[in-house]
Regions:
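A structural signal for multi-pass alpha-helical bundles of membrane permease subunits
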Residues: 13-295
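Short, Lys/Arg-rich, polar N-terminal cytosolic tail immediately upstream
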Residues: 1-12
């Protein structure tokens, strides 16, 4: 009898917990589901100049195939994604190793190493606009001090993508470093003791032990950064707005301009849903890779 009463009490407590959490869960689901469903619906609509909308079927998606700006935006998005991700993973691992081995480094210095990613992207973009100013910026001043010619970093079609990638890498490499540092601190010390007894050099230890054991952590960092990099918007909009011309016009910037400058909401929704599919594809690919390298 007592067991039955205890079971009934537990069931009642579970029902009470479910009832109390239901409004918050419903609100969260609605806040996520409504924009997604509404955007999908908009992707099948077309809007006239007077604001009248009508069902367009797959017209917005078929337009993507012949849209030169879409393919250019896709290329720019992939170029920025690959360049930024490689820079952030390479230098993030290096910075994590520095912080891991420099245990006597003062706390204030460690904080300075990781401070950039705590800065709002808009502030970071404005700061780099000043630094890279062709007339008064510190970057060209340093180049000229070494006898090198100045460069118009953000106005050059050749340099704008590497420059934006460097700005984003400056901000988010410390974030990758913190993730990798957590992975380093969780590695079993016994394997390093065995390597030291065997006389392995630091490079061999990193190559044969540290890097293989860190691969799942590095892939996790790649997943987190991939989602942001494929949706890259804020720093580009602050520094170049997709220019010069369309040299840094990513899919996100292009979709924003189509929707809010040309007011083609249906086509902009189709662009954003296509970008969302690309993001999901990248995440799934990296998840498979993480499963393959897990230990």
């Amino acid at each position: 009898m007592s067991d039955t009463a205890a079971t009934l009490t537990q069931d009642r407590q579970k029902l009470e917990m479910a009832a109390l959490s239901a409004p918050a869960v419903a609100f969260t689901v609605a806040m996520i589901a409504f924009p997604v469903v509404y955007t999908i619906w908009l992707g099948f609509q077309t809007f006239s100049s007077t604001g009248k909308q009508s069902f367009a079927g797959l017209a917005n998606y078929s337009k993507l195939i012949s849209d030169v700006e879409f393919w250019h935006g896709l290329w720019v998005t992939i170029a920025l994604f690959v360049l930024s991700l490689v820079l952030q993973l390479v230098f993030g691992v290096w910075l994590a190793l520095v912080l891991f081995h420099a245990k006597r480094l003062p706390g204030i210095v460690r904080s300075l190493f990781i401070s950039p990613f705590m800065m709002p992207p808009v502030v970071a973009g404005m700061m780099w606009l000043v630094i890279l100013d062709p007339s008064l910026g510190a970057a060209n001043y340093i180049l000229q001090a070494f006898g090198l010619p100045p460069s118009d970093w953000l106005a050059s079609p050749t340099w704008v993508i590497p420059t934006v990638a460097l700005i984003d890498s400056w901000q988010w490499t410390p974030y990758v470093a913190l993730i990798v540092l957590g992975g380093l601190q969780s590695l079993p010390p016994s394997v390093y003791e065995a390597a030291q007894i065997d006389g392995a050099s630091p490079f061999k230890t990193f190559q044969r032990i540290t890097l293989p054991l860190l691969l799942p952590t590095i892939v996790t960092a790649a997943i987190l950064r991939s989602v942001d990099l494929l949706r890259f918007f804020d720093i580009i909009y602050i520094t170049t707005q997709g220019g010069p011309g369309n040299a840094s016009n990513t899919l996100n910037i292009y979709g924003f301009r189509v929707g809010f400058e040309f007011f083609d909401i249906g086509y902009a929704s189709a662009l954003m849903l296509t970008l969302t599919a690309i993001v999901f594809g990248a995440v799934l690919a990296f998840n498979r890779l993480r499963g393959a390298v897990a230990w």
